[in-house]
């Protein structure tokens, strides 16, 4: 089974599909913000940046999936983004479940000074909502709970692909199969 996942990681179509899935999630977030008028909070913005990391890893893996260095780089960026996104989403759910005055998220994002995304792209990365508000739900789950499921799936995907990189692929031999 690990050989299947290693071969899967060496195909460009896998990385394109990963890129498209992250692009769809980013587009959906922008539709929720600008189309439906839902105000994103700081944690929503951070989760959006984590999805951008997964999108970026799909782009890197798509460049040359057969090159081990680029494949490992894409896996590391994707795994790091999935872990960070999952941790952020769990913390965001804590803000929604335990609504206390001392359990609040910041109102202004804390981006590095060298990468102030909220200043460069305010229509995308400027928060205007509260982290404890639940403004949307689907099938009984809030948006944050769905984000946890999505990041958990990405995390499992990247873990399996990372482990499969250590599996040696044997050459097909015609004799003595």
From Swiss-Prot:
UniProt GO BP: protein folding
Domain of life: Bacteria
Record-annotated membrane-spanning stretches: 15-31, 50-65, 73-90, 146-164
Cleaved signal peptide residues: none
Intervals, Cytoplasmic compartment: 1-14, 66-72, 165-177
Side Periplasmic, residues: 32-49, 91-145
Pfam family name, one: DsbB
Keyword terms, alphabetized: Cell inner membrane, Cell membrane, Chaperone, Disulfide bond, Electron transport, Membrane, Oxidoreductase, Redox-active center, Transmembrane, Transmembrane helix, Transport
Disulfide bonding pattern of the chain: 41-44, 105-131
SUPFAM superfamilies assigned to the protein according to its UniProt record, in alphabetical order: DsbB-like
Molecular function per GO: electron transfer activity; protein-disulfide reductase activity
Its membrane topology: Multi-pass membrane protein
Location in the cell: Cell inner membrane
GO cellular component, one term: plasma membrane
Role description: Required for disulfide bond formation in some periplasmic proteins. Acts by oxidizing the DsbA protein.
Family in the record: Belongs to the DsbB family.
NCBIfam families with a match to the protein in the record: PRK01749.1
Stored HAMAP family: DsbB
Protein name per UniProt: Disulfide bond formation protein B
Organism of derivation: Histophilus somni (strain 129Pt)
Gene encoding the protein: dsbB
């Amino acid at each position: 089974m690990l050989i299947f996942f290693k071969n899967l990681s060496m195909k460009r179509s896998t990385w394109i599909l990963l890129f498209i899935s992250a692009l769809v999630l980013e587009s959906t977030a922008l539709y929720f913000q600008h189309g439906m008028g839902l105000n994103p909070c700081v944690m929503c913005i951070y989760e959006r940046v984590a999805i951008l990391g997964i999108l970026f890893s799909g782009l890197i893996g798509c460049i040359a999936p057969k090159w081990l260095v680029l494949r490992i780089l894409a896996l590391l960026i994707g795994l790091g983004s999935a872990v960070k996104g999952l941790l952020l989403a769990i913390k965001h759910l804590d803000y929604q479940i335990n609504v206390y005055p001392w359990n609040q998220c910041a109102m202004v994002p804390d981006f590095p000074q060298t990468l102030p995304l909220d200043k460069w792209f305010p229509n995308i990365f400027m928060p205007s909502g509260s982290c404890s508000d639940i403004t949307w739900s689907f099938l009984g789950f809030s948006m944050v709970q769905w984000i946890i499921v999505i990041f958990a799936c990405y995390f499992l995907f990247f873990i399996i692909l990372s482990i499969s990189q250590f599996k040696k692929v044997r050459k097909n031999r015609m004799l003595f199969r």
